[in-house]
Amino acid sequence: TVSQYACQRRTTMENHNQIFTDAFAILAENAEFNESEGPCLAFRRAASLLKSLPHAISSSKDLEGLPCLGDQTKAVIQDILEYGQCSKVQDVLCDDRYQTIKLFTSVFGVGLKTAEKWYRKGFHSLEEVQADNAIHFTKMQKAGFLYYDDISAAVCKAEADAIGQIVEETVRLIAPDAIVTLTGGFRRGKECGHDVDFLITTPEMGKEQLLPKVINLWEKKGLLLYYDLVESTFDKTRLPCRKFEAMDHFQKCFAIIKLKKELAAGRVQKDWKAIRVDFVACPVDNFAFALLGWTGSRQFERDLRRFARHERKMLLDNHALYDKTKKIFLPAKTEEDIFAHLGLDYIPPWQRNA
């Protein structure tokens, strides 16, 4: 039987049901744009389930006994099986609001609320938005427009590795024994992504808050195009957060950095490419939890927390694991330790592409 929890399924990059999961992704995104949380989650859960199946769905009989599929999602699958496409999806793709909100939110620093505001003003293109003198852009949005072409192009694995080398070299100058780990989709074996995520820690507690120094060195070198440094608000006595989307409390930095052209893929007019990079610096005692959280996928993480809460009466987040029955924090040095605490088979990063 197939588990309702993504953390009990093995999901590689090999998706046998892309025609269905692509449709669900569009419907989920549209639901998100309409702030319909329930349907959005239902479509994402269904997509996640289908991604984990070792075979392609070829008839409605294949759906028998599968969890996570409601009437709405089954109707979409049925449509695609019969007509090769789903009319609901086609309607969304042709919808003016969907197209415009998707375009606006593709700008770094533009969220749903802002995109909605621009759409209500009657704007339909990025040019129209930028031409309006009444709009005051945030520092983040200005960077988003300035480097739009670079940032909206995919980042490939070779570029992520090149950035990794730069990060590693810089961090080592500050703390020779620091550990730098590439997280996110690239750690799960993806070939491309939208940004590059790194987790940094040091063997000695308290030495890990080194991002301001990294920023400083890069500013001197002229590597930084934009950055936003968020200081740590971590408190080790606080219980893990119940809300999935809550940002974690470690020191972190959202940046856009220059990658020299010979290191970047594809032909470009200038001799560098702007790439989005996120760094998180965490204490070594929390490293395993942060690594698990930042590796993803989001659906995998969401289900891992849901499993912990409902099946084990435990609270899990990017900082810690807390046993509500015993009223204690459970320590972990590795991701394997966390899976063991939860009584789950260990699932390696490349099988977490839920």
List the model feature ranges, each with a label:
Residues 11, 33-34, 87-90, 293-294:
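Short, polar/flexible loop-turn hinges at active-site or ligand-entry regions and domain interfaces
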Residues 24-40:
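Short, aromatic/basic-rich helix-turn unit that serves as a nucleic-acid recognition element
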Residues 261-354:
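Catalytic cores of NTP-dependent nucleotidyl/adenyl transfer enzymes across multiple folds
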Residues 256-260:
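Active-site beta-strand termini and strand-to-loop segments that position acidic
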Residues 14, 40-186, 190-194, 200-255, ...:
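Accessory alpha-helical DNA-binding modules that contact the DNA backbone or grooves
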Residues 1-14, 28:
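Intrinsically disordered, low-complexity N-terminal extensions of nucleic-acid-metabolism proteins
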Residues 13-24:
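Short amphipathic alpha-helical heptad-repeat segments
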